[in-house]
């Protein structure tokens, strides 16, 4: 596999030092001393799995159940009397879980840290990180916007940085990237149970863990190692087979599912993907699918370990994690058992999917691109006649793979004499992604097409931009 990321570049751009990971993560050393390893505890998880099996009557377990039950603080209590009847647990009883890792974004971390400071603890009980991405407004461009945000939000950033230093929490400075892309690149690993103070935290599940979005009070539970309670979700199985056409991406899978299931179709469920079609999808594509599971109300999503996950771990400097995960997968930890029963199953033939778009107003309004023009011309159509702007970015569309595809399209359009007709903004998911875009001339291809590169942050996706609607 080619070197996917530019990992050693170290320079000053956009007004801040970029490139090397530690340049942004100012307190990596402190966090590493308290929590010396980010390697999942596979031996312990496998041992607990062997203890769980008799408690559920030896019935086949879904991957979601394996990852949850191996994180139970007391399986004998939480699974008492369950036997082989899955309905006695799924959707029926609360699970008391131990959390492996916590991630917080700058807008929601403030109250969580203030509450944690009253607990009398000298450091966080689990590995944790804070990411400055939500409070950076997109007005002019990367450098000007970052400098403005550093000034207007200086008190917030100073508080977050000092609290992280005091309590051994890793702090990612403004400009380092979007929380979910950074977590995927650095922390997510197969088999982990993670929490994040953002609804799109399930993005990390694309690497085979269970990542769940929570509020500040739940974050304090994790920081203090208080048992985290979750009503055991039901499991919605999605069987993938076939192969996507060249114009489709993994995003079309979740857009299709949103149209089929609606915004409430996943409520109370973990969406668990299985089937041969999974082997054709990249890890960043799986992250996109799990990220947008939030749009159907899912608790999170689950994926069995695939070689694509191992390649991504290797490309981001985590070869040891990949090797350990492969061994855990062979031992049966990172996939569902044969003959497992789901509460509901949806079948998706990847070869039959078409490029599509969802919206406006609701993320379950799915329209195939081939039908879009005719649909837009209908009198009752909610789609606008003109576009106000375009964004290539957000936590679900800002990976290196996303950017390279868009750059290729931009170059094809330029070759045909086509020009951008509306404002086009680009927000790389992380400084690692942006540096690699620069190295591979992807950033140049997009800016030559008329795009404006913004800071590595949420920006327009969460309304942090100068919006000028068509009248």
Cite the ranges covered by each PLM segment:
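Fe-S-dependent hydro-lyases/dehydratases of central metabolism
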Residues: 25-471
């Amino acid at each position: 596999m080619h070197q996917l990321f530019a990992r050693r570049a170290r320079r000053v751009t956009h007004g801040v030092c970029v490139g090397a990971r530690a340049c942004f993560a100012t307190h990596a050393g402190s966090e590493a001393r308290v929590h010396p390893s980010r390697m999942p505890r596979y031996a312990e998880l496998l041992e607990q799995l062997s203890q769980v099996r008799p408690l559920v009557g030896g019935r086949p377990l879904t991957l979601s159940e394996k990852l949850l039950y191996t994180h139970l603080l007391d399986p004998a209590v939480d699974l008492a009397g369950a036997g082989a009847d899955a309905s006695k647990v799924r959707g029926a009883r609360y699970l008391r879980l131990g959390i492996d890792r916590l991630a917080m974004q700058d807008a929601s971390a403030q109250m969580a840290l203030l509450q944690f400071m009253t607990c009398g603890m000298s450091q966080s009980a689990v590995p944790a990180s804070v990411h400055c991405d939500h409070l950076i407004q997109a007005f002019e461009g990367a450098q000007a916007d970052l400098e403005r945000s550093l000034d207007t939000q200086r008190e917030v950033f100073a508080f977050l940085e000092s609290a992280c230093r005091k309590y051994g929490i890793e702090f990612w400075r403004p400009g380092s990237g979007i929380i979910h892309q950074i977590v995927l690149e650095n922390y997510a690993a197969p088999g982990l149970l993670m929490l994040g103070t953002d609804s799109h935290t399930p993005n990390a599940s694309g690497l085979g863990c269970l990542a769940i979005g929570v509020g500040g009070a739940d974050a304090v539970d994790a920081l203090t190692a208080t048992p985290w309670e979750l009503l055991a979700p039901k499991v919605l199985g999605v069987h993938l087979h076939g192969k996507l056409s060249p114009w489709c991406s993994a995003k079309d899978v979740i857009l299709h599912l949103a149209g089929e299931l609606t915004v409430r179709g996943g409520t109370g469920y973990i969406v668990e993907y299985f089937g041969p079609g999974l082997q054709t999808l990249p890890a960043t594509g799986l992250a996109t699918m799990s990220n947008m599971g939030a749009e159907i109300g899912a608790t999170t999503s689950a994926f069995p370990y695939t070689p694509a996950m191992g390649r991504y771990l290797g490309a981001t400097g985590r070869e040891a994690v990949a090797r350990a995960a492969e061994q855990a997968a062979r031992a049966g930890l990172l996939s569902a058992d044969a003959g497992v029963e789901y509460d509901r199953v949806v079948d998706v033939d990847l070869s039959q999917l078409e490029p599509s778009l969802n919206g406006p107003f609701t993320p379950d309004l799915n329209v195939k691109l081939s039908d879009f023009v005719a649909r837009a011309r209908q009198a009752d159509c909610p789609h606008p006649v003109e576009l106000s702007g375009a964004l290539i970015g957000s936590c679900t569309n800002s990976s290196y793979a996303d950017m390279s595809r868009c750059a290729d399209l931009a170059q094809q359009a330029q070759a045909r004499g086509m020009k951008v007709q509306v404002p086009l903004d680009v927000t790389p998911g992380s400084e690692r992604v942006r540096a690699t875009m620069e190295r591979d001339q992807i950033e140049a291809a997009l800016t030559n097409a008329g795009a404006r590169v913004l800071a590595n942050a949420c920006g327009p996706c969460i309304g942090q931009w100068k919006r000028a609607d068509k009248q």
